[in-house]
Amino acid sequence: MKASSWRAGPRGRALAVCLVAAFMTGLDVSIVNVALPSIREGLHAMEDGLQWTLSGYALTFGLLLVPAGRLGDARSRRTLFMWGVVLFTLASVACGLAWNMNVLIVSRLLQGMAAGMLNPQVSGLIQQMFRGHERGRAFGALGATIGVSTAAGPLIGGALVTGFGPELGWRWVFLVNLPIGLALLPLAHRVLPTPDPAQLSGRRESMDPVGVLLLGLGVACLLLPFIQQHQWHGQAKWLLVPAALIVLAGFVAWERAYRREPLINLALFRKRSYSLGSAIALFYFAGFTGIFFTFTLYLQSGLDYSPLMAGLSITPFALGAASASVVGGRLVGRAGRRLVAAGLTIVIVGLCATMAATALVPGHDVGLATALPLLIAGVGSGLVISPNQAITLSEVPPAGGGSAAGVLQTGQRLGSSIGIAAVGSIFFSSLPQGWPTAFRHGLLVLLTCVSIALLAAGYDLIRTYRR
C-alpha cells in the first residue's frame, strides 16, 4: 500500500491524533524551563518548589508508563488514551490557575501521571495499526514529534512569557494545553481504533498488583536522589540507589515466578534488538535532554537573553531533529542500527562544534555562533530517536506493544532525570569559573552519555556482522 493512501485514510487520521497527544506531553517536558523566573516572582517560590515543578512531572511520568502500557494492552488503549487526555487537560488548567506553589506542584504531579497514561498508548496504537515499513515511517513521525516538542518547548514558552508578560505568561505556558485537549477528545473518540472484543476476551487476568508496587517503588527510589540532588542536602539520599536496586531485583524475581499475567515480559530482554535499544535510549536521553536545561540557563542567566531569544537560539536543534526524523523513519527498514550509529556520531560532532563555538565566540553572540552546530546535532538526534524506537520494538508482538513501549520510555525518563542531575551538578560546581566554562563542562557530561550510547550501537553492529 502506498504511503499516501494510509496517510489519507483512517489510520493516518488516527496517527495524527496520537502525534498531537505526544507533542502536547513532550512539550511540557521543556516548555516550563524558560518560565521558571516568572513563576518564582509570581508565586514567590523557593528553589525547591521550582525544582519540583520540573522534577515532579518527570517522576510521575516515569512511574505510570509501564503500568499504563500494560493496562492499555489488556483492556483498551483507546480508553486509556482518552482518560489520559482528560486528566492532562484538567491538570494543565489547574497549573495555569494555581494560586500558590503547593497547588502548582500537585497539579504538575497529576500532569505527569496523565502523560504517563498517554504515551504508552501512542506507541501501542502504532504497533497495532502499522506493520513493516509503514511502522517505521509512523515511528519516524513520532520521533519527529518528540524531538520537535522537546526542542521547541523553550521557544514556545519564551513566546508566551514575552507575549503575555511575566505575570500572566507563565500561566499560559500551561493553559495552552486546554484548546489542544478539547480538540483531541472528540477526534480520539471518532478515529482511534476500538479493541477487538474477541482479542481481549482472554486478556482480563490480574494486572499483577505486586509487580506494579515493586516496580513503582524501585523507580521512585532510583529517581528521587537525582531529581532532588540540590534540594536534599547530605549524602543519605544516595542510599536510595542501592535500595532501588534491591527492590528492582525483587521485582525481577517476582516477575519470573508470577505466571498469570506478569507486568513485564522479561523474555523481551533476551532479544538483542530490545535490550540494546533500551540501553541506547537510556544513555542517549541522559545526554540529549540536558542540552536544553544548561543552554537556556546559560543564555538567560549568564548572558541576559530574554525567554523568547533563548528559545529561538535552541530552534536550530528542533529544525534539524524534525527534518531528519522523517528521513530516518523511511531509511530505518534498510539501514537498521547503522542509521542509529551514524546519528549518534553526528550528534557528537555537533556537540563538539557547539563547545568550540562557545569558546571561540564568547559573549552575547553565542546564540548565533551555535546555530549551525546545534542544527547538526539536531539532524543526528533525528536519526537516533525514531529509528532506535522502531528497531527496539520491531520484534515485539502488537499485543504487548504498550507495555514494551512503557519500559522503553521509562528508561528514557530515567536517563533524562539522571542526565539533568549529572550535568546540573557539574554545571553549578563550575560556575565560579564563569558561565561559558560551566556550560562547556556540562557539555562534556552530555558527550560522555552519548558516547556510551554509540558504544552500545557499535556493539550491536559488530554482533550483527559476525553472525
Give the residues covered by each predicted segment:
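Membrane-helix interface/capping residues of multi-pass secondary transporters
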Residues: 47, 77, 101, 132, ...
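Hydrophobic transmembrane-helix bundles of small-molecule transporters
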Residues: 162-279, 305, 313, 446-447
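Intrinsic disorder in cytosolic terminal tails and internal cytosolic loops
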Residues: 1-10, 197-203, 460-467
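Transmembrane-helix signature of multi-pass solute transporters
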Residues: 87-97, 110, 114, 180-187, ...
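12-transmembrane solute porter fold
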Residues: 12-27, 32-34, 237, 260-467
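Transmembrane-helix bundle of Major Facilitator Superfamily
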Residues: 1-190, 355, 425, 429
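Alpha-helical transmembrane segments of multi-pass secondary-active solute transporters
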Residues: 50-51, 80, 138, 172-176, ...
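Cytoplasmic-side transmembrane-helix entry/capping segments in multi-pass membrane proteins
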Residues: 83, 135-148, 204-211, 270, ...
